[in-house]
């Protein structure tokens, strides 16, 4: 990892930006299927399908910001808007429940999360690549990918530990191996208690993610604005 890259102001912003964003994106969002299966009782297949709003948001934001960046020649606003969208998504996900209103909040929240991902990640990669010489493009792209993944690993471990601390001793661990079966527990009182513990534990994760999203917003506002490079590839060498 070329350390001289960290002398560049853009990289000093994009690296922590993608790391903190990755903490939320990979950490908090990994538990959405668990909530859908355990609390709402949907099948694993349907819990995967219910994540489509995230991918729809990613696609819309990625394509939209790409076109707008090309048209306007500036990229600075999109990570800020993406970070705000990510924070809104966390707020809405913290409200999700098995009620109709709670599921609506979750689905809309997933769209905002997707918009946040699409606004932050591709734009940070573009800004970083635009800030370095062509010979460092591969290295700097790897740096961004590494810190995004590192943030995800840390986030997944941290949110997993938080969830465990909330449910340890309150829910039989065997139930978590087949979360959909919780809805089939014959003892109504036990079932409601388990669902309440899981629901409160999972939504707590998104409440914790809200201040992290605010940190992402603050970092995004520090991103320097640089004119986009108007040429592609390495400069040609005259061999005559």
Residue map of PLM features:
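12-transmembrane solute porter fold
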Residues: 1-169, 205-216
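Short, surface-exposed, charge-dense and proline/glycine-enriched linear segments
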Residues: 78-80, 85, 171-172, 186-187, ...
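Short coil/turn linker and secondary-structure boundary residues
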Residues: 1, 42, 177, 185-189
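Short, Lys/Arg-enriched, Gly/Pro-containing loop segments at transmembrane-helix junctions
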Residues: 1-4, 169-174, 227-237
